[in-house]
Amino acid sequence: MGFRINTNIGALNAHANSVVNARELDKSLSRLSSGLRINSAADDASGMAIADSLRSQAATLGQAINNGNDAIGILQTADKAMDEQLKILDTIKTKATQAAQDGQSLKTRTMLQADINRLMEELDNIANTTSFNGKQLLSGGFTNQEFQIGSSSNQTIKASIGATQSSKIGVTRFETGSQSFSSGTVGLTIKNYNGIEDFKFDSVVISTSVGTGLGALAEEINRNADKTGIRATFDVKSVGAYAIKAGNTSQDFAINGVVIGQINYNDGDNNGQLISAINAVKDTTGVQASKDENGKLVLTSADGRGIKITGSIGVGAGILHTENYGRLSLVKNDGRDINISGTGLSAIGMGATDMISQSSVSLRESKGQISAANADAMGFNAYNGGGAKQIIFASSIAGFMSQAGSGFSAGSGFSVGSGKNYSAILSASIQIVSSARSISSTYVVSTGSGFSAGSGNSQFAALRISTVSAHDETAGVTTLKGAMAVMDIAETAITNLDQIRADIGAVQNQLQVTINNITVTQVNVKAAESTIRDVDFAAESANFSKYNILAQSGSYAMSQRNAVQQNVLKLLQ
């Protein structure tokens, strides 16, 4: 090998290798000091792109977890508020149950209603004030609210919370048929009871025998209430049109085939003859007699069989119908119609031509005065809702007009044939009660009769003995039937809140499962990113040692190579 001075190839090679070693040593020191394998795109462009994507996904999943926890917090806030509302509803139902017995007076029931009103106010207060970050939760506006729970857009869970105000919950369906005055066999079917199928009940005979009538039908309906969601009550009751007046029954007077015979009774049945005689055979007839607060005779079927009077109970008893099979009331714990069909429905007052009183009543509506329509649908009235029935004593219209004190008798200026149509006055629908039978005909006021409110003939209003019609009822639990209705409505409200809470619980569980899943996903994504981005300290330490030694040996080699060139001087000595 020749000696050259101008170009030191060995030194140049040593220098080049030293530069590479120094660069690699710098990279190794950078990795060891940062803990990252990739500190710049030059380190691993493809790996950096993948790692950045994974880092973004992990960060997004972390926020999604926070979103899910926020959603759970919202739902838990609503759930706890509704738990308090349920306690209020339990108390309302308990107080309604307390009022649903005739040991309570109007005064004590009014006190109970006042308590219920206060409880409803607090229930509404909870519904209107429960909020999260300024958003109302229980007022009905929190519907289809979305929570992002994924790393990509539109990966959401929706949550809705139903309204819980007293005007929105407890909506209960009440339907009561017309008064039934005929017997028969009923085959009742509930249409689409579950939204798809029909439910057919076993046929029931409506008659006056034991084990028949609306009581037997109600028992059949209630036996299947868990499946259909419909419960039934019955009211088989004949109420006198006026306070008991002196009279007598016929010798063949009988109730439900059991002969009671002739009884003489005085005004108000003060001697107790009529009521005692009827109650003496109540275990056989199934019919019990009593007087209401107005002194009217009340015949009540204890087991729901019909009430059939044969012979004559006497006009003084005021019983309008000698055959009565009562009214059937249906209750459903939601506001949807009860769609019925079947055979023999006229025997339960629910035939095609019968008037069925229907109403959906919310919890708030039970707080104030119960309207006539709602009261009739709830089964308050023993008779069908509608126009008033005027009850007077006479053998006929002409006979009535001829009676002294009628206002149409001699010298009054009015007569049957006066051309004024006074033979048709008897306001809306007047029942003429003769001394021989219970009811004659119904008459309607003729136009131009001159007999109306404000007509100047108002003195004739004194001839009205009684009015039987649907009318408004006092608030809530202030009546026995009202208390029963409030129990039904409170039960519906409890069911409504339980359903809302169940929906909330389902969403909470869904969110929790999602959070658990994306937490695991986030861990795995971070692990994948770490595998790509983070440095392996064991391998990198070995790598650092390698380049550190090479750097030192390179410096030594370069020094030695420069020293070799000094040998040229020896040739010149």
Swiss-Prot record:
Its main location: secreted. Keywords: Bacterial flagellum, Secreted. GO terms for molecular function: structural molecule activity. It holds the Pfam family Flagellin_N. GO terms for cellular component: bacterial-type flagellum; extracellular region. The keyword NAD does not apply. Flagellin is the subunit protein which polymerizes to form the filaments of bacterial flagella. Heteromer of FlaA and FlaB. A flagellar filament composed exclusively of FlaA is indistinguishable in length from that of the wild-type and shows a slight reduction in motility. The flagellar filament composed exclusively of the FlaB is severely truncated in length and greatly reduced in motility. Thus, while both flagellins are not necessary for motility, both are required for a fully active flagellar filament. Belongs to the bacterial flagellin family. This is Flagellin B. It comes from Campylobacter coli.
